[in-house]
Amino acid sequence: MTNKVIVGSRKSKLAMAQTELVIASLEKIFPDIKFEIKNVITEGDRNRHVSLAKIGGKGVFVKEIEDELKDGTIDFAVHSLKDVMPILPEELVLGAFPKRVSPYDCLVSRKNLSSLNDLPKGARIGTNSLRRQGQLLSIRPDLKIIPIRGNIDTRLRKIDTEALDGIILAEAGLTRLNIDLSSYHVLDLQNYIMPAVGQGCLAIECRKNDTRIRKMLDQINDEESAYCVQVEREFMRELGGSCNFPIGGHAYAKNGQILFDGLIASPNGEHVIKETKIPANNSGVGKKVADQLLAKDKFGIIEGE
C-alpha cells in the first residue's frame, strides 16, 4: 500500500486554504501518510471576467478536477460544495463533508450599516451571483447591481476602484482565509438572503470504487452536515440548478430536528417564491419542496422569463 495520497485543488488562496484544512485533519488521524497537493486550473479560473452563467454555471470550477480523478492522477479533491454540480459523473462520489461553517452571506462596506435600509438610494452593490441579486432586489429594487468576479482580495479592492457602496461575500470564505476586515463594516445578511445550496460546506470527491480513500475520508465526515447538504442537493437536482436563475436552499438543525428552507426568484427580484421551516428529518423533503415551488411558479422563473 502506498503511503502517498495526491489531493486535487484549485490554485486560489481560498481553495488552497480549504485543502490544507482537510489535509491537516487527515494528518492527525493518518500520521504515516504523505499528502501532496496537485493544483488544477479550471475553466472558471481561466475565464475570470465572464459571468459564471455564461461559461457553464457551477461546473466550471470542478470539471477539470473531476477529469483528473477519472484519469487516476489524483486520489481525491477538495471543493467548495456550492461549486459542485447536483449530478456527479457516474464513477465519482462525494466521500466526505467536513463540519460546515457559516452558510450565510454578508455585505462588506466602507459605510457603517445596521440594515439594508441604511444603504443610500441607488447604491452600487457588487456581486456576480443571481441568487444574491434576485433576493437583494426583492428588498431594495432601487439598488444597482454591479457584476464582479475574482478572488476575495480582488473583490474587496473593487469597493474603492469601482466606487461600490458594498459587496456581498460568503462568510465562510472570509473565516477560512482569516481576512482582516478592520477597515470595513460587515453586515450579516442571514435575515435577508437565503444561502446557496451547500454554502459553507466543503465536499471531498473521490472515485466510487476506491475503498481505501473512501474509508479514510469517512473519518472526517460530519454526519449532520452531510445530511443537511444532501437535502439541499436533492432540492437543487429537482430544480435542475446551476447559476442560471436564483435558487436558495438551506437545511439546518434546530431544537432536535432538521428544518429546510427553499427559494426560487427572478433575477430582477420581482418574484420570490419560498417555503421555510419545513421539517426534513425524513427522506424526500428536498424534492417535495422543489415540487411545491415549481407548482407555485406562475411567473416563468424556472423558464427564465
Swiss-Prot record:
Q: How is the cofactor bound?
A: Binds 1 dipyrromethane group covalently.
Note the InterPro entries from the entry: HemC, Porphobilin_deaminase_N, Porphobilinogen_deaminase_C, Porphobilinogen_deaminase_C_sf
**Molecular function (Gene Ontology), one example:** hydroxymethylbilane synthase activity
Give the UniProt entry's GO cellular component terms. cytoplasm
Q: Which residues carry this modification: S-(dipyrrolylmethanemethyl)cysteine?
A: C243
Remaining remarks: The porphobilinogen subunits are added to the dipyrromethane group.
**Which HAMAP family does the record cross-reference, listed alphabetically?**
Porphobil_deam
How does this protein assemble? Monomer.
Function noted in UniProt: Tetrapolymerization of the monopyrrole PBG into the hydroxymethylbilane pre-uroporphyrinogen in several discrete steps.
Q: What family does this belong to?
A: Belongs to the HMBS family.
Name this protein carries in UniProt = Porphobilinogen deaminase
Species whose genome carries this gene: Limosilactobacillus reuteri (strain DSM 20016)
Lineage at the top is: Bacteria, Bacillati, Bacillota, Bacilli, Lactobacillales
